[in-house]
Curated annotation (Swiss-Prot):
Protein's organism: Rhodopseudomonas palustris (strain ATCC BAA-98 / CGA009)
Residue intervals passing through the bilayer: none
Lineage, opening ranks: Bacteria, Pseudomonadati, Pseudomonadota, Alphaproteobacteria, Hyphomicrobiales
Classification via InterPro entries: Ald_DH/histidinol_DH, Ald_DH_C, Ald_DH_N, Aldehyde_DH_dom, G-glutamylP_reductase_CS, Glu-5-SA_DH, GPR_dom
Protein name, as recorded: Gamma-glutamyl phosphate reductase
HAMAP family: ProA
Signal peptide: none
A Pfam family reported for this protein in Swiss-Prot or TrEMBL: Aldedh
Compartment(s) of residence: Cytoplasm
Catalytic activity: L-glutamate 5-semialdehyde + phosphate + NADP(+) = L-glutamyl 5-phosphate + NADPH + H(+)
Gene, per the UniProt record: proA
Coiled coil segments of this chain: none
Amino acid sequence: MTASLKAIDGSAELTTLMTDLGRQARAAARTLALAPPEQKNRALEAMERAIRAGADKILAANAEDVADAKAAGTTSAFLDRLTLTPARVEAMAEGIAVVRGIADPVGTVTESWQRPNGMTIERVRVPLGVVAVIFESRPNVAADAGVLCLKSGNAVILRGGSESFRSCRAIHDRLVQGLREAGLPDAAITLVPTRDRAAVGLLLAGLDGSVDVIVPRGGKSLVARVESEARVPVFAHLEGVNHVYVDRSADLEMAKSIVLNAKMRRTGVCGAAETLLIDRAAATTHLAPLVTMLIDSGCEVRGDQTVQQVDPRVKPASDEDWDTEYLDAVIAAKLVDGVDGAIVHIHNHGSHHTDAIVAEDAQAAAKFLGEVDSAIVLHNASTQFADGGEFGFGAEIGIATGKFHARGPVGAEQLTTFKYRIHGSGQTRP
């Protein structure tokens, strides 16, 4: 039985609570690792129904969180990330349906070969175990992480931001309902039942060996703390200082469409473009139309000296602007010396998240895609496609920007590791 959602008083009680949560999650992970795909899919189907049936309660809980956030004077970008709408709740349910429909990664034989001595060796996907997901303002992460971990046979411990506490609790209630309908343990998806920030430190310490991997979803300070203090492996989800480079060969109308979508579709998501780079050779044809379009669409443009000259509404860019994830209707813009200049700028200022080139020149595109060292690189497409759902994963637990184990959108398959199965017929080693 999981811990009740109650106020926690005192560090000793919190430590006991968190340790118990870890042990329960570890026990649930052993059950999930052996659960057949049909049982996991029954749970996912029940969760999808429960999210839709409980939409009013989820939205009511979210409205309370949003009201508190507004009273605290939070930014519009933060409020956008925090806010749920009927459409966003429906998207949550639809995401669960997609996850249910993807192939179960657990037990998949990824490679098989036979040795000269007759032994057969297989590499097989297996769950990671217990995943701790620490996130900030986005309540939908609770659903995404919960269902992806379930699909991949992992137990998950969710620790959402205090600002989204009620929303996460309402979503978690529906996920647990689905687990119960399928006969799976409640502790397969656990929500840390307190706003106490000390709970994060206990998670980072690994809960006495119960946590196998930590996934942080949030701003630079959260990710930095996790990477600094964690005693278990981390799938780092760094900030998205994302670039769109418009090459001299770019079709102007395509460039305008991509740049506008990459920046303004949703400014508060990690796939939003934060810097616009324009080929100096295209300055006379592409610069003014792109800058004017952005400003007329409500986006503040901060530019270098040349960019400032094309529209009096452009504000001067500071050195800090080239390294900033705004998550708001603000973009930095500058001219660069062709694709090589764009690559150098991204190397110096990017966050290895998502970067795009708009170009008709196939050689320029190939150079950009090959040399920009980011988890996601795009040719003639918006950076806002940096999303597990758009990759066909149904959802994502984060965008991993590191290079070990997982990179890019972390879906169900990326939440597995592997083991080797060896079949012999009495072989002994000479």
